[in-house]
């Protein structure tokens, strides 16, 4: 009876391992197809993605209040790009991430020169939203693009001469000199 139980446990754990391994392989294939990279690069990218949190926490702390955006580039290789408000020497870093079994270098590009931090952008979003609400009643989305610093307010409506005049008026009232 013990042998049957041990064999059953061994078989079920083997099936679980095979299923989880199959899921990992499917993730690698999907990433490879989505981003147009080979499976080795996809495997590396997924590993870095899974182990990046502590590195991002350290970057957030180092540049506290000055980060304009953080985003991922997948081509030609996986890397994290950090846009920083103000001036400085752009730099490339490799931060070791991983676990007890495996480690890898997480490439991070620090790019200076952003005009506003995320916090300032949120304030500008609120200001823009108030102005837009005065002219349009059908706001669809409000967003901040961390890659380029653009603030976008989308409204439902047609591009009529009247609506385009409203947009020009809103931009004039908004008067944000830090727009990209």
Language model regions located:
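Structural signature for extended repeat/solenoid scaffolds and their inter-repeat hinge/linker regions
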Residues: 41-45
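N-terminal, post-cleavage mature segments of outer-membrane
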Residues: 26, 46-50, 57
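Cleaved targeting-peptide boundary
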Residues: 19-25
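Short glycine/threonine-rich beta-strand-turn micro-motifs
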Residues: 29-34, 52, 62-122, 136-173
């Amino acid at each position: 009876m013990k042998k049957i139980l041990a064999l059953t446990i061994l078989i079920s754990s083997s099936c679980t391992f095979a299923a989880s391994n199959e899921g990992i392989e499917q993730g690698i294939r999907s990433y490879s197809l989505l981003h147009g990279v080979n499976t080795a690069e996809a495997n590396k990218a997924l590993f870095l993605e899974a182990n990046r949190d502590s590195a991002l926490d350290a970057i957030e702390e180092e540049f506290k209040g000055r980060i304009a955006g953080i985003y991922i580039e997948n081509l030609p290789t996986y890397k994290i790009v950090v846009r920083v408000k103000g001036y400085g020497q752009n730099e490339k870093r490799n931060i070791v991430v991983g676990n007890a079994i495996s480690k890898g270098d997480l490439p991070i590009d620090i790019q200076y020169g952003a005009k506003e931090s995320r916090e300032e952008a949120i304030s500008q979003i609120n200001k823009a939203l108030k102005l837009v609400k005065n002219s349009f009643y059908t706001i669809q989305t409000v967003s901040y693009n961390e890659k380029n610093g653009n603030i976008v307010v989308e409204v439902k409506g047609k591009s009529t001469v009247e609506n385009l005049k409203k947009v020009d008026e809103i931009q004039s009232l908004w008067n944000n000199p830090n727009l990209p």
